[in-house]
Amino acid sequence: MNKVLVLMGGTSEEREVSLKSGKAVYEGLKDAGYEVEALDFTPETIHRIREYSPDVVFITLHGKNGEDGTVQGYLELLGIPYTGSGVLASAVCMNKVITKKLLSYEGLPTADFQVIKKRGFNRDLFNPDLLMEDFGLPLVVKPATQGSSVGTSIVRKRKNIVPALELALSLDEEILVEKFIAGTELTVTVLGKDNLKTLPVIEIVPKNEYYDYESKYMPGMSDHLIPARISEEERERVEEISCKAYDAVGCRGYGRIDLILDRGGNPYILEINTLPGMTGTSLVPDAARAAGIKFPELLDLFVKMALEK
C-alpha cells in the first residue's frame, strides 16, 4: 500500500480554500484505500515532509509558495514524487503575465492585454484614458500571481480604473489589464502528459457578475452545467485549444483550463490552473463525476500518474 502525504494550508491568501481541498482529498484517498497523512504546510513544518517518508505527496496548496513551483522544487530535491505539474509549468502558470506572453507566442487565443508594474506607477500621473483607448470599457484588472480571483476587478466606469489598479498592485508587483470579453465561461480539465485526455466541458454560470472568489467556493453561488450549452464544433475547438495550452506550458498529470467563448463562438484562454481546487464546489471533481469517475477513483488516478513520472 502506498503512503500518501497531503499538503494543505500554506501561507497564501488562498489558505482556507487549500484547507478545504486538503480535507476532501484526505478523506477521498482513505476511501480509495491509501495510507494517508496530512500536513498543514508552513515554513515551520516543511522539514516534517521527510519525517513522514511518503511514497507520494498530494499537493492541495493554492497560490504563492505552493502552486508556483517552490514546493515542487523542494520535493524534487528530496526525490519524492508529487501530484500535478513540475517546477517550470507551475511557475509559468502562476504568473499570468508570463502565461499570456507564452500563449500569444504559440498563437493561442487570449484577450488583448497590457502589463503595469508597481515600480513607477503613480496614481496622480496615471491617465486612465490610455487604457480606455486600448481596451474600452468594461476592462479587467488582475494581479499577476494571485489565484481564486483574489484582487480581480471588472471595471465599468472610468473613475474606478485607478482604484482597481491600486487594489491589484497592493497584492502584486505587476498586474494585467485585459480587454473584457463577453460570452460563456467554460472550463476544461486535461489529464495526462503525452496522450492527453479531457473531461467533459463545463459551463460556469456564476450568480455574481463573474466567477469570483465567492462564486468559486460558496455553495449555491454558481451553477456548473454539464454538458455545456455549446455546439459540438465549439466543444471540439475548446478541447483542442485547451490541450494545446496545457502542452505549451508543459503541464503534466492534470490541470484545468479556463476559457471564455465569445458571442461569435470564438474561444479565448483566460487561465491555466496547475493545482485546481478539490473542494465540494470545485470544477474538476464535477467534471469527473460527469464522466462516471468517482472522487476516490479520480484521486487514485492522480497518485498513479505521479508515480509514473
Curated annotation (Swiss-Prot):
Disulfide bonds: none annotated. It is found in: Cytoplasm. Gene3D superfamilies: 3.40.50.20, ATP-grasp fold, A domain, ATP-grasp fold, B domain. SUPFAM superfamilies: Glutathione synthetase ATP-binding domain-like (SSF56059), PreATP-grasp domain (SSF52440). ATP binds at residues 132-187. One of its GO terms (molecular function) is ATP binding. Its cofactor is Mg(2+); Mn(2+). Its EC number is 6.3.2.4. The keyword Chaperone does not apply. Mg(2+) 1 binds at residues 258, 271. Belongs to the D-alanine--D-alanine ligase family. This is D-alanine--D-alanine ligase. The gene is ddl.
